[in-house]
Amino acid sequence: MALNLRKNHPLLKIINNSLVDLPTPSNISAWWNFGSLLGLCLITQIVTGLLLAMHYTADTSLAFTSVSHMCRDVQFGWLIRNLHANGASFFFICIYLHIGRGIYYGSYLNKETWNIGVILLLTLMATAFVGYVLPWGQMSFWGATVITNLFSAIPYIGQTLVEWLWGGFSVDNPTLTRFFAFHFLLPFVIAGLTLVHLTFLHETGSNNPLGIPSDCDKIPFHPYYSIKDLLGFALMLIPFITLALFSPNLLGDPENFTPANPLTTPPHIKPEWYFLFAYAILRSIPNKLGGVLALAASILVLFLMPLLHVSKQRSMTFRPLSQILFWTLVADLCILTWVGSQPVEHPFIIIGQLASFTYFAIILILFPIAGVLENKMLKL
C-alpha cells in the first residue's frame, strides 16, 4: 500500500496532526473560534506591518511625514495603514473574547496553555503600545512619555531605568528607534509563543462547553472545524474591512493628526480603547507606585485563575451564581473602559475607584466564595 504523504512526511505530519486529523470535541461552540481568528489577526498584522515598515522612517523628524507620505503617495498605502491600525483593535476584541471564554468554561485548568496565553496577552499589549508611538503624533509622544514614566515609580532604580529605556533624558529619537525595533521583533515572538501555546493545548486536547472529558466523543478537525473556522473568518473580516474602509479613524484619537510637540500637552492623555480599563485602574489609586502595582495586578491576576478555582465543576454552564458574577465582571470592565476615557474629575474618580475595587473583589474573593457555595448546593 502506498504511504500516505500527509501522515508520513516530517513536515506535513505536523500540520496534519494540528489542522487535519486533530481529534476535537464534537460539541465545541462558536466561542472556540477565536483562537483561529487570533491567528488570522496575527498574520494580517505581520503582512500589513511588513508593507508599512518598507515605507516608514524611524526618525523623529521624518516619522510623521513618512506615515503621511504612505497614505498619500504609496499605492493603497492608506488601505494598508487603515487595515493595520484597525487590525490591532480586532486583535484585542478577539483576545478579550478568547480570555472571557477561557474564564467562563474553565479552560484555565489547562495550566500550561493558560499561562502561555497570559504571557501572549502581555506581549501583545507591549507590541501595541510601542506600535502606537511610531506615527509620532501628539498622543503617540505623550502616551509614550506617561506610560514609560510609570517605571520611575519603582523604588531606588526607577529613574535610572526610565532614562535607560528612553536612551536620554526624555522621549526622543533614540526612544523612537528602539520602539520601532521592538515593534518589528515582538510579533515574531508572539508567533513563536503561539506555537508553544498550541503545543501545550494539543497535549491535553480542547476543553468543551460542558467542562467534561470528551475523549469518548471526538471528531476530526477537518472538515468539521476547518469549515467552521472559515465561516468565523468571513464573519470577522466583514466588519473589519467595513471599519477600515468606511470609518478608519473611528477608534483613533484626533490628537494623533498633530505632529508630536514636547512643548504642548494634549488636554486629555489617554491610550487606545483596548487599554482604557487598565488605565482606569491605574488612575483610580492616588499613589504613583500603588497605581503601577494595581495596573500590573489587573493583568497578572489572570495567572491566579487556576489557583482560585474551588468548584467541583469545571465550566460555569451549570453554575448560576458564578454566571451572575462573570457577567457582572464583564459589565464592570465596560464601566472601567468608559471611565478610562473620561477626564479625572467628579464623579468619574469615585466611579473608577469603585469599579477597580469590584474588579479585584469579583476575581479574588467572590468567584471562590461562589464556587464553595455551589459545591454545598450540589449536596442538597
UniProtKB/Swiss-Prot annotation:
Subcellular location: Mitochondrion inner membrane
Subunit field text: The cytochrome bc1 complex contains 11 subunits: 3 respiratory subunits (MT-CYB, CYC1 and UQCRFS1), 2 core proteins (UQCRC1 and UQCRC2) and 6 low-molecular weight proteins (UQCRH/QCR6, UQCRB/QCR7, UQCRQ/QCR8, UQCR10/QCR9, UQCR11/QCR10 and a cleavage product of UQCRFS1). This cytochrome bc1 complex then forms a dimer.
UniProt protein name: Cytochrome b
Disulfide bonds, paired cysteine numbers: none
Cofactor: heme b
GO biological process, one term: mitochondrial electron transport, ubiquinol to cytochrome c
Cellular component terms (Gene Ontology): mitochondrial inner membrane; respiratory chain complex III
Key words of the record: Electron transport, Heme, Iron, Membrane, Metal-binding, Mitochondrion, Mitochondrion inner membrane, Respiratory chain, Transmembrane, Transmembrane helix, Transport, Ubiquinone
Note on how the cofactor is bound: Binds 2 heme b groups non-covalently.
Topology relative to the membrane: Multi-pass membrane protein
Residues the record lists as binding heme b b562: H84, H183
